[in-house]
Curated annotation (Swiss-Prot):
UniProt catalytic activity: cytidine(1402) in 16S rRNA + S-adenosyl-L-methionine = N(4)-methylcytidine(1402) in 16S rRNA + S-adenosyl-L-homocysteine + H(+)
Signal peptide: none
Top-rank EC class of the record's enzyme: transferase
Molecular functions (GO terms): rRNA (cytosine-N4-)-methyltransferase activity
InterPro entries named in the record: RsmH (IPR002903), SAM-dep_MeTrfase_MraW_recog (IPR023397), SAM-dependent_MTases_sf (IPR029063)
UniProt keyword terms in alphabetical order: Cytoplasm, Methyltransferase, rRNA processing, S-adenosyl-L-methionine, Transferase
Cellular component, GO annotation: cytoplasm
Pfam families linked to this entry: Methyltransf_5
Protein's name in the database: Ribosomal RNA small subunit methyltransferase H
Gene transcribed to yield this protein: rsmH
One of the GO biological process terms: rRNA base methylation
Upper taxonomic lineage: Bacteria, Bacillati, Cyanobacteriota, Cyanophyceae, Oscillatoriophycideae
Cellular location(s): Cytoplasm
Basic residues: compositionally biased ranges: 284-299
Function: Specifically methylates the N4 position of cytidine in position 1402 (C1402) of 16S rRNA.
C-alpha cells in the first residue's frame, strides 16, 4: 500500500465535510426512480448520500481527484450496495463515461473544509505546513515549486488572474526577493509584510487571495473546470440536469458562461441560487456558494 493510500485510510474518518445547498441541489436535480447520477466531486459523500436516499434504486457514480476524499466517501457510504455506487479516482476533466448516460450531474467546486483544515495538505495560511496544496497528491507540482521557480512577472500575473489580488506586483516582488519558501506560515508572513499596514489587519487576511491563486494554479482548477463543462453536457440523457456549485467569482463566471454557451443545454437558473440565512449561520463557509442549473435539451 502506498504512503498516500495509507494516509487516505488513516484520515478518511476525519474527512467530515458539510455539503452546501443540499436541499436546493436535490430539488433542482428532480431525481427520478431508477436514475443514474454522476457526483463529479464526491468529497466526503454528503451530496451522494442525499441522492441515494431519494429512491432505493437510484445509482451514483462518484469521482474525486483526492484519494483521501475517495477513501472517506467509501467509508461514509459503505451501507449502500456496490451495485448502486461506483467510485472513480481522478480529475473530473479526465473522466470518460464511455456510452454511459446520466440523469443528472453535480459538482461542488473548490477546496473542501477537510482539505483546508488538514495541516499536512498546506492549503491554509493559518496552519503551519509544507507549501503543498495538491488535491491529487500523485501529481508532482506543489505550491512550493511554483513560488520558488516562477519569475516575478509570472507570480504577479498568477496572483492577479487567479487570486484577483490588486497588490500582486508588490507581493510578487517581495516573494522573489526573500525566497525560497517551504512553509505556509513563512509565505503568509512575507505577504503580510509586503502590503501597506491598512491591509494587514482588515477583514480579509492579506494572504487569502494569494493562496487562492496558488491553489488554483497548482491544481489547474479553472482549466479543468472549462474542460469538464465542455464535455459533461453530452453525458446527460435528454432532460437530464447538471448542477454546479461554485465558491468564487472566477468559477462562477466560467460556469455561467459555459452553461449558457452549450448548444445542448437550457439554463434553468437566471440568477444563481444562494444558501438561505439559516444555512449560512450554521455553516459560515457556505456564504459564498452559488448554484447554477441547466437541463439537456430534447434532440
Amino acid at each position: 500500500m502506498s504512503k498516500v493510500l495509507q494516509m487516505s485510510t488513516v484520515n478518511s474518518l476525519a474527512f467530515i465535510h458539510i455539503p452546501v445547498l443540499t436541499q436546493e441541489l436535490i430539488k433542482g436535480l428532480d431525481i427520478c426512480p431508477g436514475g443514474h447520477y454522476l457526483d463529479a466531486t464526491v468529497g466526503g459523500g454528503g451530496h451522494s448520500r442525499q441522492i441515494l436516499e431519494t429512491y432505493g434504486d437510484v445509482q451514483v457514480t462518484a469521482i474525486d481527484r483526492d484519494e483521501v476524499a475517495i477513501a472517506a466517501a467509501t467509508t461514509n457510504l459503505a451501507d449502500y450496495n456496490t451495485d448502486r455506487l461506483t467510485f472513480w479516482t481522478g480529475n473530473f476533466a479526465d473522466y470518460d463515461p464511455g456510452n454511459l448516460k446520466f440523469d443528472g450531474i453535480i459538482a461542488d467546486l473548490g477546496v473542501s473544509s477537510p482539505q483546508l483544515d488538514s495541516p499536512e495538505r498546506g492549503f491554509s495560511f493559518r496552519l503551519d505546513a509544507p507549501l503543498d496544496m495538491r488535491m491529487d497528491r500523485r501529481q508532482s507540482t506543489t505550491a512550493a515549486d511554483i513560488i520558488n521557480s516562477y519569475s516575478e512577472i509570472e507570480l504577479a500575473n498568477l496572483f492577479y488572474n487567479y487570486g484577483e489580488e490588486r497588490l500582486s506586483r508588490q507581493i510578487a516582488k517581495q516573494i522573489v526577493k526573500q525566497r525560497p519558501f517551504f512553509s505556509t506560515t513563512e509565505l503568509a508572513e512575507v505577504i503580510s509584510r509586503s502590503v501597506p499596514p491598512k491591509y494587514r489587519y482588515g477583514r480579509i487576511h492579506p494572504a487569502t487571495r494569494v493562496f487562492q491563486g496558488l491553489r488554483i494554479a497548482v491544481n489547474q482548477e479553472l482549466d479543468s473546470l472549462e474542460s469538464f463543462l465542455a464535455k459533461s453536457p453530452s453525458w446527460l440523457k435528454t432532460n437530464g440536469i447538471i448542477g454546479i456549485i461554485s465558491f468564487h467569482s472566477l468559477e462562477d463566471r466560467i460556469v455561467k458562461h459555459q452553461l449558457r454557451a452549450s448548444p445542448l443545454l437550457k439554463v434553468l437558473t437566471k440568477k444563481p441560487i444562494i444558501p438561505q440565512s439559516d444555512e449560512q449561520a450554521k455553516n459560515p463557509r457556505s456564504r459564498s456558494a452559488k448554484l447554477r442549473l441547466a437541463q439537456r435539451k430534447e434532440q
